[in-house]
Swiss-Prot record:
Its EC number is 2.4.99.17. It is found in: Cytoplasm. Monomer. HAMAP family: QueA. It comes from Burkholderia pseudomallei (strain 668). GO terms for molecular function: S-adenosylmethionine:tRNA ribosyltransferase-isomerase activity. The lineage of its organism: Bacteria, Pseudomonadati, Pseudomonadota, Betaproteobacteria, Burkholderiales. This is S-adenosylmethionine:tRNA ribosyltransferase-isomerase. Pathway: tRNA modification; tRNA-queuosine biosynthesis.
Length: 360
């Protein structure tokens, strides 16, 4: 049985990318060819700008069009005590769920001043979050006064460059507190080259929550509880997936967030005895080796943290030994890791279920 320790590896800290490269598509791309089960994976070092040459006409790329909120606030209580607020999810025009760091948990009815700009009122507790009531449209106030919530392993304060580069060029629907980072490599030139090659594009929305950085704290993976995130698939996306299947093309998820949304929707549809359809729902899907993929054939993804649920996901998709070999190569070749790091292109191995935790 696989345990948390099976997904650990040593990463030199200098390989954690602290800033974005000057050009999005100048990042590196490790193409992993693991289609021959009797041979080691073939690892090809590329530039991300070469991605169009790695996919075929008639394939479908599925992007997550979520937009990162300026979700972090510093503020104070009426007593003058300092607080830090991280918006987790906008739940209404004037309400949101948030994490609050303070010397003492604020009870309902407490007034908090955020960014020396406006006051919010603390409402009911929705574990582990607090409900916040805003005086006006919270999306407007968040965008105007908040700070970009860079990941905890990025050590500098967010600056003007981050406000551009920690968003994808196709970000459209505000609601995330972390970027769908595989999408950060795509620029207009790469998108145009994909279109010229006859590769289709579609979007879904999954609002990435702060739980994406939550560590797994249990050795037995069956005991881990995933955070929940909201997602939406449209009729247009579902129709494009069906058309791609009909012409023999491959569905390529851009990022683990797109993967999780597609697979969650397909799993739930199958459980209900119906085909994949447009949906708006919540998912806490936890994909580990043994999971049977229903939609995604290939995956564009960044390099992930040791012991993370995302490392488990890519291991389920491509095979544990394939991922171990790819990560060893990436470290030896000095690839850049995590959100501002480089990317890899993986292909699903249907025999990758070397152990079972995630279930069908």
């Amino acid at each position: 049985m696989l345990t948390l320790s099976d997904f650990d590896f040593d990463l030199p800290p200098e390989l954690i990318a602290q800033t974005a490269l000057p050009e999005r598509s100048a990042s590196r791309l490790l193409e992993v060819d693991n289609t021959n089960p009797s041979a080691p994976p073939r690892l090809v070092d590329r530039r991300f700008a070469e991605l169009p040459a790695c996919v075929a006409p008639g394939d479908l790329l599925v992007f997550n069009d979520t937009k990162v909120l300026k979700a972090r606030f510093f503020g104070r209580k009426a007593s003058g005590g300092k607080i830090e607020v991280l918006i987790e999810r906008v739940t209404g025009e004037r309400t949101a769920l948030a994490q609050i760091r303070a010397s003492k948990s604020p009870p309902p009815g407490t007034t908090l001043t955020l960014a020396d700009a406006f006051d919010v009122t603390v409402g009911e507790r929705v574990e582990p979050f607090f409900t916040l009531h805003f005086p006006d449209d919270c999306l407007v106030l968040i965008e105007r006064h908040g700070r970009l919530p860079l990941p905890p392993y990025i050590e500098h304060a967010p600056d003007a460059a981050d406000e551009t580069r920690y968003q994808t060029v196709f970000a459209a629907n505000p609601g995330a507190v972390a970027a769908p980072t595989a999408g950060l490599h795509f620029d207009d030139a790469v998108l145009a080259a994909l279109e010229a090659r006859g590769v289709e594009r579609a979007t879904l929305t999954l609002h990435v929550g702060a739980g994406t950085f939550q560590p797994v704290r249990v050795e037995n993976l069956a005991e881990h509880r995933m955070h929940s995130e909201s997602y939406e698939l449209t009729d247009a996306l579902v129709e494009k997936i069906a058309a791609t299947r009909a012409r023999g093309g491959r569905v390529i998820a851009v990022g683990t967030t797109s993967m999780r949304a597609l697979e969650a929707a397909a799993r739930d549809a199958q459980a209900a005895g119906r085909p994949l359809a447009a949906t708006r729902a919540e998912t806490d899907i936890f994909i580990t080796p043994g999971y049977r993929f229903r939609v995604v054939d290939r995956l564009v993804t960044n390099f992930h943290l040791p012991k993370s649920t995302l490392l488990m996901l890519v291991s389920a998709f491509a095979g544990i030994e394939t991922i171990r070999a790819a990560y060893r190569h990436a470290i030896d070749a000095r690839y850049r890791f995590f959100s501002y790091g480089d990317a890899m292109l993986l292909t699903r191995r249907d025999d990758a279920a070397e152990a079972t935790h995630g279930g069908a």
